[in-house]
């Protein structure tokens, strides 16, 4: 099915596509392409819409590495969107490392996986 956005898309609105990454990986898993394609469709329909791709990591490992990895994850998503015809000028990226966890946890591997994620935020 197609993703339909029923909420008006205003600056700061966050879209959680449940795109998660393997440990120490910046590679987008193929099962997430359809979710990213819903953003491609949205950006092709809303020609003036700009977004911020936020990369996140779990708390495992050194924060310096987590920030680098979360930046690389955000950039991987930006590059995917560009490969589908979206102008890179419409997409900002930022990596937060482990500073904004979706879930707080005590060393739980399922929750760690949910914190290794991407969020899309409306920028205008």
Where are these regions (language model features)?
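Periplasmic peptidoglycan-binding/tethering modules of Gram-negative envelope proteins
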Residues: 1-50, 124
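Periplasmic OmpA-like peptidoglycan-binding domain that tethers envelope proteins to the cell wall
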Residues: 27-33, 54-124
């Amino acid at each position: 099915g197609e993703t339909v956005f029923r909420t008006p898309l205003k600056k700061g609105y966050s879209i959680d596509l449940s795109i998660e990454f393997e440990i120490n990986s910046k590679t987008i898993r193929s099962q997430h392409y359809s979710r990213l394609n819903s953003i491609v469709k949205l950006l092709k329909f809303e020609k003036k819409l700009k977004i911020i791709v936020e990369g996140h990591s779990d708390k495992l490992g050194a924060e310096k590495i987590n920030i680098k990895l979360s930046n690389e994850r955000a950039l991987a998503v930006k590059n995917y969107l560009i490969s589908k015809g979206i102008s890179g000028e419409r997409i900002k990226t930022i990596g937060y490392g482990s500073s904004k966890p979706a879930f707080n946890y005590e060393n739980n591997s399922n929750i760690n996986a949910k914190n290794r994620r991407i969020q899309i935020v409306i920028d205008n």
